[in-house]
Structure formats: C-alpha cells, structure tokens
Regions:
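Short alpha-helix boundary/capping motifs
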Residues: 40, 61-62
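Active-site-facing substrate-recognition patch
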Residues: 1-53
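Short Gly/Thr/Asp-enriched flexible loops that form oxyanion-binding sites at enzyme active sites
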Residues: 66-76
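Short, glycine/charge-rich flexible loops or terminal/linker lids adjacent to PRPP-binding catalytic cores
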Residues: 76-100
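Short glycine/proline-enriched coil/turn segments at helix->beta-strand junctions
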Residues: 51-54, 75-77
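Residue-level marker for well-ordered alpha-helical positions
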Residues: 44, 65-66
Length: 100
C-alpha cells in the first residue's frame, strides 16, 4: 500500500452505526471529495494484481464508480454499473438477491 493511501485510511473519520464502527473514506463514500491522486494510486495497484482480459469492467452502483472510471480510462475498457433500480431498458438483466 502506498504511504499516501495508508495515511488517508489512517486519518479517515469513523462513525458508529448501531454497534458497527464505519469508516468514512473518499474512495468508499465520496466524502470528503475524492483526491484524483488516490484514484490513480488505487487503480495502478489494481492493474498490478488483477487480470483485465475482459470486454467490460463491471462495478456496483455508487461506491465503485470512481475506481471503475479510473480503470476504464487507463485500460481503454468500457465499464457498466450494476444498479439497485430497474430501468426496463432493452438488454437489461434483472438479478434478485435476498440476504438476511
């Protein structure tokens, strides 16, 4: 992990949500604003360990979008977002998962 990324995690705010300590970090929450340098660092780290022999990068709605964007720009691979809401678009795939 880069020193800059480590410092950003060590210095992020932590809030209690019920009995859970939840850390607030720009890359996970977009709060405070996302530093482009952190996106650069994280996307480089992912490119070093992941195989991106793919046609499309897939990310979860909201939290994954900044990192998917950075990877897409660097790799020249389009990305798509898995969303909670259904739009009834042509070719849209509906997947349901129930937990708890």
């Amino acid at each position: 992990m880069s020193d800059e990324l480590r410092r950003s995690v060590e210095n992020c705010d932590v809030v209690m949500i019920g009995d859970y300590e939840y850390f607030i970090h720009p890359l996970a929450d977009g709060i405070p604003s996302v530093d482009p340098k952190l996106l650069d660092i994280v996307s480089d780290m992912m490119m070093a360990v992941c195989d991106f022999d793919c046609d499309v990068i897939v990310t979860a709605e909201a939290m994954g979008i900044p990192i998917a964007t950075a990877l897409s720009l660097k790799l020249g691979i389009p990305f798509t977002v898995i969303r909670k809401r259904k739009y009834d678009l042509p070719g849209e795939v509906d997947i349901a998962q129930y937990t708890g």
